[in-house]
């Protein structure tokens, strides 16, 4: 059975792992002539820890998200893709990717970077890719 992915979603956060996933998503979008949806989730949970610095932190996170998405979109366009959209959301990346963004863009495939969490970090933070695999209804590719 042959699968044709119409919309490929790639979450990016500026990390090396997400940039590798972006490269793979671009390759796949070119191969399948797919729409590429590039998403960034601003994790607002971290602002509650520093109420005095909430506004500057939110502004920095917003600016950083805009920069990350612009660079990723430019990379995709430089590679020859013409159907590229960017999505910026606030919330928990662990739930937003699979439960909100993927259904909104009607993603057939999510391409994500593997995280480098150790056992202790994973217990406290959890893995975004692991949560996305658990909650997604479409295919997922984890890139190492």
Predicted regions and their residues:
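Short, well-ordered secondary-structure micro-motifs
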Residues: 21, 48-51, 96-99, 122-124
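Structural beta-alpha unit
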Residues: 1-3, 74-110
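Gly/Ser-rich helix-loop-strand patches that form or flank binding pockets
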Residues: 27, 103-144
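Small/aliphatic-rich secondary-structure junction motif
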Residues: 2-52, 75, 79
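Short beta->alpha linker loops
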Residues: 42, 88-92, 115
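General small-molecule cofactor/ligand-binding pocket signal
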Residues: 39, 85-89, 141
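Generic structural signal for helix capping and beta-alpha/helix-loop junctions
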Residues: 45-46, 93, 119
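A short acidic, glycine-rich active-site loop
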Residues: 55-67
């Amino acid at each position: 059975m042959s699968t044709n992915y119409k919309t490929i979603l790639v979450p990016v956060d500026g990390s090396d792992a997400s940039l590798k996933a972006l490269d793979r998503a671009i390759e796949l979008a070119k191969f399948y002539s797919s729409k590429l949806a590039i998403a960034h989730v601003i994790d607002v949970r971290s602002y509650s820890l520093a109420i005095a610095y909430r506004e500057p932190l939110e502004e920095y996170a917003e600016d950083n998200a805009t920069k990350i998405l612009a660079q990723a979109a430019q990379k995709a366009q430089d590679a020859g893709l013409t159907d590229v959209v960017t999505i910026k959301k606030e919330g928990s990346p662990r739930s937003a990717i699979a439960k909100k963004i993927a259904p909104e863009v009607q993603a057939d495939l999510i391409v994500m970077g593997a995280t480098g969490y150790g056992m202790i970090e994973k217990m406290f933070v959890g893995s975004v890719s692991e949560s996305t695999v658990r909650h997604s209804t479409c295919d997922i590719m984890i890139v190492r």
